[in-house]
Regions:
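Active-site neighborhoods and metal-handling regions in enzymes and metal-associated proteins
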Residues: 2-468
């Protein structure tokens, strides 16, 4: 298939009338731009924790939290770099990551020896930055089930039948040997169950503020077995506050995720022709993700997310694409407008208008601004385009989730907050136009890193309108 496309120019003067916007179009080129679609080299694996230690310490202090206990796999990963494999296997969250106000620079990982064997990140120095409490299985399961005293639960005899009989025919692979060494080193902190490890952590904590943050209600059951008089607050919200500002190690992974995700989206957009289906296009995006060791999350095409919708792509109808995939947990989020053949004049005016707005918002994306400031500016700029199609803008922090930001209040349903932009936030400025009867849909979305002096684009921001 011969593929060609046009790029909408974005240098549009302020206050230009709609007819002027529509007149701005780029020169035709053949095939996807190599600089944006060449395969990217994988980044080096960060050697230390992903956790933003200084911010974590500040958040714990500001919220007067003595102990943060997390069991959600995403939060465990953020605090420890460890992937709880039992979660991936559908066996539940059988790990805890614990961060104390006394040692916010040194998380505790309470997990099964089997889980450490399967998923422990032993190929980096991160093992040296974590304290481990490992559990295996009670030596007497029946007797253990009848224990009520927490000291008996903590000190219950443990079976040591974990590793198979060891032979000396060949050396173990280095990463396996490191895991085994860590297991042996942590032997004094072995417990019969996950609960025993957490009870020990609770008894060893000095509760200055009498406050524990948890990200899962089931943790309350273990806390209730102690005689601690403590307040319980929303730990998931607390971790999301920490995650607003990325650490240097997170930024390494996120730079790659943003670029590789955008590359895969562009490849998919340029792969289609008249008669192709949404499934064809989505399959190309997933394939591109695989080439870059990215894990596809979803590709929204023309407001449609379900993968089994087989609809054909028609010439002249613009399609919004919203492409999300992740690398080592960190999400890329990229949106464009695609059309087979020339779009209608109205839709071309829309895509030019989105470019006009984005190019003038970008210089204002800086620390100290709030989401509401960006909304107000976007509304003003929309008025300057003379468009009557309607307009939406959704700035959101991106990280270990597509929308990685704390809710307005503890627990309950998530509610969007008016967040103040901060240095080292990774932000999406999301500007979709959904189906409203004008001949198509449109989208413009890039990821930016907020620095000291403004925002840095993490993916190239060309090809606002992709014509194939």
């Amino acid at each position: 298939m011969d593929i060609s496309r046009r790029s909408a120019l974005t240098a549009i003067t302020a206050g230009t009338a709609l007819t002027g916007l529509a007149a701005c179009s780029g020169a035709q080129s053949s095939g996807p731009d190599k600089k944006t679609t060449s395969k990217l080299p994988l980044p080096d694996t960060p050697s230390g924790l992903l956790l933003n230690k200084s911010r974590a310490a500040r958040i714990l202090d500001e919220n007067k939290v003595d102990l943060l206990i997390c069991s959600q796999a995403r939060n465990v990963y953020y605090l420890t770099n460890q992937v709880p494999m039992t979660s991936r296997l559908g066996m539940g969250d059988y790990s805890y990551a614990v961060l104390s106000a006394k040692r916010p620079d040194r998380p505790v990982f309470i997990t099964g020896r089997y889980n450490l064997y399967l998923g422990g990140a032993a190929d980096t120095d991160v093992f040296n930055e974590i304290d481990f409490k490992l559990f295996s299985f009670p030596e007497d399961p029946v007797g253990y089930g009848g224990l009520t005293d927490i000291k008996d639960i903590i000190n219950a005899p443990v079976t040591d039948a974990f590793y198979p009989k060891q032979h000396q025919d060949a050396a173990l692979p280095p990463h396996i040997q490191r895991k085994k060494d860590r297991d042996i080193k942590a032997k004094q902190a072995h417990f019969a169950t996950l609960e025993g490890g957490l009870l020990k952590q609770l008894l060893d904590t000095d509760f200055k503020h009498k406050t524990i943050a948890i990200d899962d209600p089931k943790i309350r059951e273990t806390i209730a077995k102690t005689d601690l008089d403590v307040r319980i607050v929303d730990g998931d919200r607390l971790v999301k506050k920490m995650r607003l500002q990325k650490s240097a190690n997170e930024i390494i992974l996120h730079r790659y995720a943003a670029r590789a995700n955008a590359r895969s989206a562009r490849l998919a957009a340029n792969s289609i022709g008249e008669g192709a289906t949404l499934q064809d296009m989505r399959g190309e995006f997933f394939r591109g993700c695989g080439e870059q060791t990215m894990k596809p999350v979803y590709m929204l095409i023309d407001s449609i997310v379900p993968e089994l919708v087989p609809r054909e792509i028609k010439r002249g109808r613009t399609l919004m694409i919203d492409c999300v995939s992740e690398f080592q947990g960190y999400h890329g989020d990229f949106g464009r407008t695609v059309c087979v053949g020339e779009p209608s004049r109205k839709m071309k005016q829309v895509t030019d208008g989105l470019s006009y707005i984005w190019d003038r918002i970008l210089p204002e994306v800086k620390a100290g601004k709030k989401y509401s400031d960006l909304h107000a500016l976007a509304a003003k700029l929309y008025g300057e385009t003379n468009l009557d199609t309607g307009f939406a803008i959704n700035p959101h922090n991106v990280g270990l989730q597509h929308t990685d930001e704390p809710s307005r209040a503890d627990f309950g349903l998530w509610m969007k907050d008016d967040i103040e932009l901060q240095e080292n936030m990774i932000l999406s400025i999301d500007m979709p136009l959904l189906n409203n009867g004008i001949g198509g849909t449109a989208h413009l979305e890039d990821l930016v890193l907020i620095g000291k002096d403004g925002a840095e684009l993490l993916n190239t921001s060309d090809d606002r309108l992709i014509i194939v």
